[in-house]
């Protein structure tokens, strides 16, 4: 069955895929979800990367090599020890989609990060509540809670986190950042950043992000009949997710998102990568946001635009065969972007920690000119002195019970599973 699905995914004309998605997204919720789920269900070999979670902290999936062999405790340990953590929020018009719908992209990123940089990455992909059962701001609260659990609950430093969101997921990523760092912005556009207890994340990836609730731009007029996103879907989002007209527009902070046009560093990471299609309805709104960010000059912005429809970077089937090389090209570009951003963020964190230690020393310590000064090394300092390219012991010493039927790993050539006959256990390296 997987082979059949692979053939369909690889050989379906982009125009057919686009029309199928466009139609499915406007169907009643149950039918729409079933179609999208079937089109995006992980293939057999991709399932080895998946570990599902559903607890009081968050719901979603941890995606990393051989997660299928991990229990919850080990999976969380691997997340915490990873060099890069990608906090992923899927799209789907707030009414369809799931945390493993882009496994082709996810596996590509993980493999590239390991093969090119010898670094380990883990993707924390969120399953938020879907409309119409879960209306705004419920799904946003799910994302904010999950991000808080990642950073404060698990203690993962934002300096090694890259947020990623496409379409509706892009809106949720932006709102999650605002709610976490500057929650008053959507009520008062001049409101300052409030949360300085933790640094901003290292980077953000936004693929065809929804950045405006208004459908009056020129690109909306030009492409609403041919894009994946239609006026019909927009009306469903208004009704099912935003609960219009029962809810007043002034009571919906998300409807003011497009008014944020300056001081983006109150909530945006230093490094931002944006993809957009030249044939999509959201194009003009995204371009306006990108131009505003560029004008300020405080953000390292990488902006990619290709002559395709909505969310082409994540939905590979929308790209013509002759242009498939673009996916590989931009996957590698995204990986390079992630690694550079993580290195920059970690370097800044090291500097901040050092300056803080010196400041505290100057306030509380008497220094004699001939005295050698030795500062206590905190746990954070220990972690920060670790090379980005070092192997973590955790990845080399994880013990797993031997499965009933032992199979060699064929998913990633850079990982191997060896059986330790003396201890009767398997070791993942």
Report residues per predicted region.
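Gly/Ala-rich beta-loop-alpha elbow adjacent to hydrolase catalytic centers
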Residues: 165, 169
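Fungal intrinsically disordered, low-complexity serine/threonine- and proline-rich regulatory regions
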Residues: 351-429
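A glycine/proline-hinged amphipathic helix-loop "lid/cap" segment
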Residues: 1-78, 248-249, 350-379, 385
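Catalytic nucleophile-loop/oxyanion-hole region of alpha/beta-hydrolase
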Residues: 98, 105, 121-160
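Short, well-ordered amphipathic alpha-helices
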Residues: 62-68, 104-114, 144-151, 173-191, ...
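Short, surface-exposed "cap/lid" segments of acyl-processing enzymes
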Residues: 69-112
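Alpha/beta-hydrolase active-site loop signature
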Residues: 93, 129-132, 211, 309
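Alpha/beta hydrolase fold serine-hydrolase catalytic domain that processes acyl esters and thioesters
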Residues: 141, 153-162, 175-365, 415, ...
């Amino acid at each position: 069955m997987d082979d059949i699905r692979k053939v369909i995914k690889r050989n379906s004309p982009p125009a057919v895929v686009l029309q199928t998605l466009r139609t499915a997204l406007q169907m009643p919720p149950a039918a729409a979800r079933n179609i999208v789920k079937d089109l995006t269900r992980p293939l057999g070999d991709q399932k080895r990367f998946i570990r599902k979670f559903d607890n009081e902290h968050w719901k979603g999936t941890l995606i990393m090599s051989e997660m299928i062999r991990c229990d919850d405790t080990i999976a969380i340990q691997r997340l915490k020890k990873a060099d890069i953590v990608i906090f992923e929020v899927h799209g789907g018009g707030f009414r369809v989609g799931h945390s493993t719908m882009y496994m082709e992209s996810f596996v590509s990123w993980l493999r590239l990060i390991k093969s090119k940089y010898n670094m380990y990455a883990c993707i924390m992909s969120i399953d938020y509540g879907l409309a119409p059962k879960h209306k705004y701001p419920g799904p946003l609260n799910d994302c904010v809670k999950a991000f808080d659990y990642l950073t404060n609950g698990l203690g993962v430093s934002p300096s090694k986190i890259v947020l990623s969101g496409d379409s509706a997921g892009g809106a949720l990523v932006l709102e999650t950042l605002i709610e976490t760092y500057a929650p008053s912005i959507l009520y008062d556009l001049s409101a300052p950043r409030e949360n300085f207890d933790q640094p901003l994340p290292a980077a953000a990836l936004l693929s065809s992000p929804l950045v405006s609730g208004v459908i009056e731009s020129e690109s909306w007029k030009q492409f609403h009949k041919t894009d994946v996103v239609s006026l019909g879907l927009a009306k469903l989002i208004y009704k099912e997710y935003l609960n219009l007209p029962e809810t007043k527009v002034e009571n919906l902070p998300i409807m003011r998102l497009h008014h944020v046009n300056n001081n983006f560093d109150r909530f945006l990471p230093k490094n931002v990568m944006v993809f957009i299609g030249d044939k999509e309805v959201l194009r003009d709104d995204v371009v306006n946001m990108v131009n505003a960010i560029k004008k300020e000059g405080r953000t390292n912005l990488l902006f990619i635009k290709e002559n395709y429809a909505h969310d082409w970077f994540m939905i590979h089937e929308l790209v013509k065969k002759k242009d498939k090389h673009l996916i590989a090209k931009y996957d590698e570009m995204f990986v390079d972007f992630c690694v550079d951003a993580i290195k920059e963020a970690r370097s800044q964190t090291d500097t901040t920690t050092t300056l803080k230690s010196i400041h505290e020393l100057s306030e509380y310590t008497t220094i004699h000119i001939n005295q050698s000064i030795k500062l206590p090394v905190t746990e954070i300092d220990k972690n920060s002195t670790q090379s980005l390219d070092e192997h973590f012991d955790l990845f080399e010493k994880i013990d797993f019970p031997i499965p009933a039927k032992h199979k060699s790993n064929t998913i990633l050539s850079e990982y191997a599973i060896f059986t330790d006959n003396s201890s009767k256990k398997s070791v993942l390296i």
